[in-house]
Amino acid sequence: VKTSFSGSAPLPLELFKRFEKATNVTIVEGYGLTEATCLVSVNPVDGEKKVGSVGIRFPYTDVRILKQIAGGDVVDCAADEVGEICVASPGVWSGNTYTEADKNRDLYHFGKFLRTGDLGRIDPDGYLWITGRAKDLIIRGGHNIDPAEIEEALLAHPAVAFAGAIGQPDAHAGELPCAYVELVGGASVTGAELVEHCKTHVHERAAWPKHVEVLAELPKTAVGKVFKPDLRKRAITRTYNAALVEAKLNAEVVDVIDDKKRGLVAQVKRTGVLHDEEVGHVLGAFTRPWDWVA
């Protein structure tokens, strides 16, 4: 084996180097999605490979980086400017991507370009770079933070095998960056040490994670992606319970459920005598909803 393929999630440069050194096998990274039927782009097997990019577009595939400007107009981004990756190809069935009609609304730009929900840029040589997911952005007091920068920094640590950065609820800023990691077998490092590591490897101060937690294993999808909804549930539970403890209230979050209309909803249980409005005052300062459970 001389070449292997990587997809499903952006490949950190540090992981690429580790894999190539350990196996002497070169990785060709590409990008595709079910909604477009097949692959969208790939690094050339025999041509120039740009590590960290997902290569150049396939034949008969058109890729544009688009953004919405003031007034609602949609325009193309400049070279190396980050926007939403939008794809038109024979594999994109405009208006019929999903069987549920509601899901197809606002899913296309200019009638045929599928909005992938992925953020990326195209460099002057035509190589596509994925920078994150629009819905994964951490919004701290109105400031957008790309979790990929935090994850790249954590994966640069020799003890870290997998990392997932998300926004944890905050009563003042809306969200603050935090991260969860899975360690390399036999490695040892604390969350506090990784927080300090990020302070020297994450360039933007606002993106420094306020909390890093080491888990025995990160939740993953069937294709090996870090499953961030489970991490968000952990963060909601941790931050809400910390707020309840600080307020000395007899209540705790016992679960976080995924409601189709409201999103993630904390389930709060009474652990003693208290007034309902006291809990409402504390948890009402956060953006994520909550409900009482018996």
Region annotations inferred by a language model:
Residues 2-6, 11-30, 34-128, 134-137, ...:
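Conserved AMP-binding/adenylate-forming
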Residues 3, 84, 161-162, 211:
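Residues at the N-termini of beta-strands
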Residues 67, 89, 95, 103-106, ...:
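AMP-binding/adenylate-forming catalytic core of the ANL superfamily
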Residues 211-223, 293-294:
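Short proline/glycine- and acidic-rich turn/helix-capping motifs at secondary-structure junctions
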